[in-house]
Amino acid sequence: MPELPEVETVRRGLAPALEGRRIVHVTQRRPDLRFPLPELFAKRLTGRRVIRLERRAKYILVYMEPAKSGGAEDVLIMHLGMSGRFTVHGPSGSSAPGLFHLGMPGGETHDHIVFDMEDGTRVVYADHRRFGFMDLVAEPELASSRHLAALGPEPLGNEFSALVLAERLKGRRAPIKSALLDQRTVAGLGNIYVCEALYRAGISPLRTAASIGPARVERLTAAIRAVLQDAIAAGGSTLRDYAATDGELGYFQHAFAVYGREGEACSKPGCGGTVRRIVQSARSTFYCPACQR
């Protein structure tokens, strides 16, 4: 599943194709994705101008002008799931694919939603597994919607700090890795970047969340921010399932210190340890037991 850096990369790729432009036609080829699409989905979007695209955790938020004068903005919430893929076809017919396809082709069979923009741009959403979803929410109700209400702070936002993280870890007996994957703790973190952040902070994934003292929390907060910023700058991580909206592969996976490196020597100078893989909550955890305490 794409994590925060990959979703942010897709948002940045879609923004030039959508922002400031009106949707002139929506093709809806099935009534549902992971969940049923909203009632009158295509009709409610047709004719609306896109104001801006934002990201919250692993969701892309498309803000649209009000349907009626004086009304509230509607927000299209999009989640890519495991296999969602956007492809942007320019007015000239050129294509800039934004892939989340696990190495499988899209093709019209899996092209479920098509947005035609006023300048001739066509944005196609394909999803062969249909684990992604879309929803429409009035802007005043966005923060309290079922998708966003329980989310923790954005790790790259001003509301995220060592003090905030320490408060959210207080009294929790779960392993620190499990606590960080809980979207109520910090929004948008996934398996890859939690492994990498814990490594940079020198914290064992087996340590209980409540045992992370102030100095470690400071290091962890800084490591989370740094790992995410580095990954976004690299265009995300290409494993089997990701390329950016311009078709370029993300390359942060080449900078992985521990993820996917079981049995390799720790890259930290003077450590001498070996990267180990364990399973926590049915997910692979990669860490160096010699320098992560």
From Swiss-Prot:
This is Formamidopyrimidine-DNA glycosylase. Pfam families: Fapy_DNA_glyco, H2TH, zf-FPG_IleRS. A zinc finger (FPG-type) spans 257-293. Signal peptide: none annotated. HAMAP family: Fapy_DNA_glycosyl (MF_00103). One of its GO terms (molecular function) is zinc ion binding. Binds 1 zinc ion per subunit. Involved in base excision repair of DNA damaged by oxidation or by mutagenic agents. Acts as a DNA glycosylase that recognizes and removes damaged bases. Has a preference for oxidized purines, such as 7,8-dihydro-8-oxoguanine (8-oxoG). Has AP (apurinic/apyrimidinic) lyase activity and introduces nicks in the DNA strand. Cleaves the DNA backbone by beta-delta elimination to generate a single-strand break at the site of the removed base with both 3'- and 5'-phosphates. DNA binds at H110, R129, R172. It catalyses: Hydrolysis of DNA containing ring-opened 7-methylguanine residues, releasing 2,6-diamino-4-hydroxy-5-(N-methyl)formamidopyrimidine; 2'-deoxyribonucleotide-(2'-deoxyribose 5'-phosphate)-2'-deoxyribonucleotide-DNA = a 3'-end 2'-deoxyribonucleotide-(2,3-dehydro-2,3-deoxyribose 5'-phosphate)-DNA + a 5'-end 5'-phospho-2'-deoxyribonucleoside-DNA + H(+).
